Amino acid sequence: MTKLALFYRHLAVKGPCSPLEWLIFAFLLPLGWLYGAVMRLRALFYRIGWFDAYCADVPVISVGNLSVGGTGKTPVVDYLIRYCRSLDKRVAVVSRGYAGGKGAALRVVCAGQGPILDVQQAGDEPWLLARRNPAAIVIVAPHRAQGVRHAVENLGAEVVLLDDGFQHLAVSRDFDLVLLDALRPFGNGQVLPAGLLREPVSALRRGDLFVLTRCPEDLAGTADVPGPVVHCRHILEESAVDLDGEVRSLRELAGLRGIAFAGIAEPEGFFRELQSHGLTLTRTLHFSDHAAYDERAAILLKDAAKSGDYFITTEKDAVKLAHMTLPLPCFQVPLRLMFVETGQLEQKLSPIISNQR
């Protein structure tokens, strides 16, 4: 991540501190107010019917957030796919996609028999969901309504998960699941570009259930939101998998020098988790979210390799490394999701999922 990007993220998360930061913030703040007003009007026009929203013939559950950047959404979507499958429902995920398969065409990543596109065509998150859940339907569609319609009418979806759908009001939904980072739910509280929020905090009134993600064990209290809240933690598995599929215990790596890298929005939490499992990290590298791992990335990794014995990264990053020749062994560590309030999410969603129109 560039110094400019790091500076902006600091400003958007913690707010201005220095005179220069206050000057920049004062310039961005009116733009944020304007953007927030536009988003309020947009939501109002959908609510009163001036803008049309596509209504599917099956239950649609939106999984989204209020801010840009990571809230740990992919593990939650993965969890919901598995839950729908446990209810014997044919489930589809419809995603806008990111940096995969340029163009506006609808792409079926998985039709229920594993991925049928490569990660470059599908995008990292849809491809990872398809690999983890080969019996699910995964579609990337810049026009989400088109993707939902295709999943239901052509592929037999009985439940649709609208990935990153909170602001995508052109598709009607039966349930809005809103994810918030437990440690920084609203950043500095301002709307883009003055902060990280896609909409004003008042938009949370549309939410049906709020999930505080990445909760530390000592978390006290909760975010001020207008609805029920559940808490979850993202926990590293006790084993790591290299790029050839060989499994090794994290304990085996603890005595070696590790170099951790990640192209996710909030890599610091991942790095801390690795260290909490006893790994010694001599260096950490933060690439941009959804990084493509190009020649520049290869040069950075080659240089970093001088100070370590192995690389370690996330599942989402590992799927994009097949084309690279790395100078050290590289391991990925899977994440699993643990809800603090066992059963509350399922209790809310079960009647929605079971209600076929």
UniProtKB/Swiss-Prot annotation:
Pathway: Glycolipid biosynthesis; lipid IV(A) biosynthesis; lipid IV(A) from (3R)-3-hydroxytetradecanoyl-[acyl-carrier-protein] and UDP-N-acetyl-alpha-D-glucosamine: step 6/6. It catalyses: a lipid A disaccharide + ATP = a lipid IVA + ADP + H(+). InterPro entries: LpxK, P-loop_NTPase. It comes from the Bacteria. This is Tetraacyldisaccharide 4'-kinase. One of its GO terms (molecular function) is ATP binding. The keyword Lipid metabolism applies. GO terms for cellular component: plasma membrane. HAMAP family: LpxK. One of its GO terms (biological process) is lipid A biosynthetic process. Keywords: ATP-binding, Kinase, Lipid A biosynthesis, Lipid biosynthesis, Lipid metabolism, Nucleotide-binding, Transferase. Transfers the gamma-phosphate of ATP to the 4'-position of a tetraacyldisaccharide 1-phosphate intermediate (termed DS-1-P) to form tetraacyldisaccharide 1,4'-bis-phosphate (lipid IVA). ATP binds at S67, V68, G69, G70, T71, G72, K73, T74. Its EC number is 2.7.1.130. Pfam families: LpxK. Belongs to the LpxK family.
